[in-house]
Amino acid sequence: MLTLDKIYHAKFILKQVARKTDLIAAPRLCPGTDLYLKTENLQVTGSFKVRGAYYKISQLSAEERAKGVIACSAGNHAQGVALAATRMGIKSVVCMPDGAPIMKVESTKRLGAEVELVKGTYDDAHDRAVELQEQTGMTFIHPYDDELVIAGQGTIGLEILDQLPDVDAVIAVSYTHLRAHETE
């Protein structure tokens, strides 16, 4: 179960890799309101996804680390997994759809992952990653449907509260999926 304690633990672990990104005022986007943008595009991999991938991988057992990790992604999660695994000395394989942006594919390789381009869509890459996970015993690092990944990504909320304690609302948009998760 996802708890606030897990998110605080993730914040502690992520100090070694994630940048505390700025909140910048954006008055022209919505005149008459105090609107701020969280600049996660300035994160170490250009996306918030590194937060979840790094925290999840940091919590693996020695046995899981020895077997390596596998993921599927069209780019941002791929880079987060590659960076995290490489920094921790863990083998990583990322299945990416063959239509993924070449810049994301090359960046994922430079960050240390073995990339397998899969003909078709994201769903095809996901199916291939699951197949490889079953064959190899590597740990599958899901891009969003994992409480440790969510805890890592949830550290953004803690930063927002530190930077803007009187915040009224937070609107979070994710390209991959928009999900609401409840914490205790």
Model regions and ranges:
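Positively charged, low-complexity intrinsically disordered leader regions
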Residues: 1-64
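Single conserved hydrophobic/aromatic residue that forms the stacking wall/gate
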Residues: 177-184
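Conserved active-site and cofactor/substrate-binding residues in soluble primary-metabolism enzymes
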Residues: 2-5, 9, 21-24, 45-52, ...
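Glycine/charged-rich beta-loop-alpha catalytic/anionic-binding loops adjacent to active sites
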Residues: 31-42, 61-68, 136-144, 163-170
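Structured catalytic cores of enzymes that bind and process phosphorylated ligands/cofactors
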Residues: 50, 54, 80-90, 103-108, ...
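Active-site cofactor/substrate anionic-group-binding motifs, chiefly glycine-
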Residues: 40-92, 96
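Small/polar-residue-rich loop-to-helix segments that shape phosphate-bearing ligand pockets
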Residues: 93-94, 98-173
